[in-house]
């Protein structure tokens, strides 16, 4: 242990030079400041390795002195602390980690100081130091950036606070006997249905179920770069397709199961044109979502009094990286599934290799299947769904349902020669047998069952191509 006390009357520059001289005899990679309360000289910053400091606010908000007073004066409901790399610009270095704490109505500066210290700094600072000790942090001093392996160093925040504002009170919740409301996250930069303006004045407001379905529909069509359309009912796709034109994509999506699409939510990933709008209003729909509309399309859509028309804006921004589900006593949080399938990474496990067309369809079906409730099965040809088996408690039942929907409800489509995607492994060969009976010729699934060999043997017996993700 070395103590380098500042002598009476000693200048800041002289004191920091003596600190550097003392440290020369040690091999170290990190300097941690705590309660130093002085701006470091440029000489110290240039000659010391990475230096960390903790600031009592969620930077870049409320930098400098009196952070707690600034927080209370601003009337915000959340503050916290920030561990950052020290740079020449005060409180502006790259952020390593942050910890949020709530602000209560009767708080004074002492209350806030204690809460930020004990609930924030005592959690965030050790976490940051541990990440450095584990070699998980890379600091680019020239670019003033920090990268942490796994974005969060492999850890979830020790505290998650919800800071949403009441956006609207709804007519009711999922059922008429339940009250309902929607809250808005003002920090969300991604296209979303909560902040989307409703363009047809006079139409009734969105319901709880409308919001739920609209969110699911929007998330599905964000998967695709080419013109895409989807129709959602009870948060499951009734159909989805990608095509050269938006109108063609909608037509193909609708014809998967027009019966189930009745009263559903339509999502489009291109500006809606008049041709597509004419198709949308040809049957009853609750909501249509798109990143813009032509004037001619709006003229068509707003003729329907109860069709809600939402403009979600550009779809190129993906800012939300976590999803969560409230449960009694807490909430489940997981990394958002933003991955796109890579056919080159598929593991072909059967004697027959999939064709290039089948690989393309596998990718499309796999992306669509992410938005189908499990147990989920998707039959697809080209880049359009043919039959969907959703939310079944056994996988073979989901296969049989997809086959039934394809045969009975699909218009001008057939499962003969189609590709099947399964959102989980097949525990037994019966799912493959049922798919073969429906005419399926290629399968994409995760694999991982103890009975994989039996399942692969069944696929080979039927002459199928099968790949594991």
Question: What is each of the regions a protein language model found here?
Answer:
Residues 269, 282-310, 428, 433-469:
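C-terminal binding/interaction regions
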Residues 1-153:
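One-carbon transfer enzymes
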Residues 83-85, 168, 230-231, 238-240, ...:
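Short beta-strand scaffold segments in enzyme catalytic cores
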Residues 147-289, 293, 298, 304-306, ...:
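Active-site loops and adjacent core secondary-structure elements that bind or stabilize anionic groups
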Residues 192-204, 257-262, 335-350, 385-386, ...:
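Gly-rich Lys/Arg/Thr-decorated short loops/hinges at beta-loop-alpha junctions or inter-strand turns
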Residues 352-376:
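Short, basic/aromatic recognition patches
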Residues 239-258, 384-432:
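Glycine- and Gly-Pro-enriched alpha-helical subdomains that act as flexible
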């Amino acid at each position: 242990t070395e103590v380098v006390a500042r002598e009476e009357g000693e200048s800041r520059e002289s004191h920091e030079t003596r600190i550097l001289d003392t440290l020369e005899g040690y091999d170290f990679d990190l300097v941690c400041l705590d309660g130093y309360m002085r701006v470091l000289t440029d000489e110290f910053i240039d000659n010391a390795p990475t230096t960390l400091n903790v600031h009592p606010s969620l930077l870049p908000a409320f930098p400098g002195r009196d952070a707690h007073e600034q927080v209370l004066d601003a009337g915000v409901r959340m503050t916290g602390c920030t561990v950052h790399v020290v740079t020449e610009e005060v409180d502006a270095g790259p952020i390593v980690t942050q910890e949020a704490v709530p602000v209560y109505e009767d708080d004074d500066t002492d209350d806030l100081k204690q809460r930020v210290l004990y609930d924030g700094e005592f959690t965030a600072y050790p976490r940051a130091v541990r990440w450095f000790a584990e070699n998980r942090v890379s600091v680019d001093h020239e670019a003033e950036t920090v990268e942490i392996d796994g974005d969060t160093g492999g850890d979830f925040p020790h505290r998650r606070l919800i800071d949403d504002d009441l956006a609207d009170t709804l007519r009711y919740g999922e059922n008429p006997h339940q009250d309902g409301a929607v809250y808005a996250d003002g920090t969300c930069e991604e296209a979303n249905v909560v902040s989307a303006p409703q363009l047809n004045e006079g139409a009734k407001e969105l319901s709880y179920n409308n919001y739920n379905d609209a969110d699911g529909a929007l998330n599905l069509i964000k998967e695709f770069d080419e013109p895409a359309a989807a129709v959602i009912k009870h948060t499951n796709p009734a159909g989805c397709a990608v095509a050269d034109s938006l109108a063609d994509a909608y037509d193909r999506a609708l014809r998967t199961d027009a019966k189930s699409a009745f009263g559903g939510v339509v999502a489009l990933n291109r500006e809606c044109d008049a041709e597509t709008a004419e198709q949308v209003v040809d049957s009853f729909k609750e909501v249509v979502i798109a990143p813009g509309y032509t004037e001619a399309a709006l003229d068509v859509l707003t003729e329907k009094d109860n069709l809600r028309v939402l403009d979600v804006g550009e779809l190129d921004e993906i800012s939300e990286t976590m999803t969560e589900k409230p449960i009694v006593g807490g909430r489940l949080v997981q990394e958002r599934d933003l991955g796109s399938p890579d056919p080159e990474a598929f593991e072909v496990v059967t004697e027959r290799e999939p064709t290039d067309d089948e690989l393309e369809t596998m990718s499309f079906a796999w992306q669509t299947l992410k938005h189908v409730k499990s147990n989920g099965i998707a039959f697809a040809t080209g880049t359009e769904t043919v039959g969907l088996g959703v939310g079944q408690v056994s996988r073979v039942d989901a296969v049989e349902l997809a086959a039934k929907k394809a045969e009975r409800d699909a218009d001008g489509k057939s499962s003969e020669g189609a590709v099947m995607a399964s959102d989980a492994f097949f525990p037994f060969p019966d799912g493959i047998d049922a798919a073969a009976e429906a005419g399926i010729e290629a399968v994409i699934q995760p694999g991982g069952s103890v009975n994989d060999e039996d399942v692969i043997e069944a696929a080979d017996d039927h002459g199928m191509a099968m790949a594991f993700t």
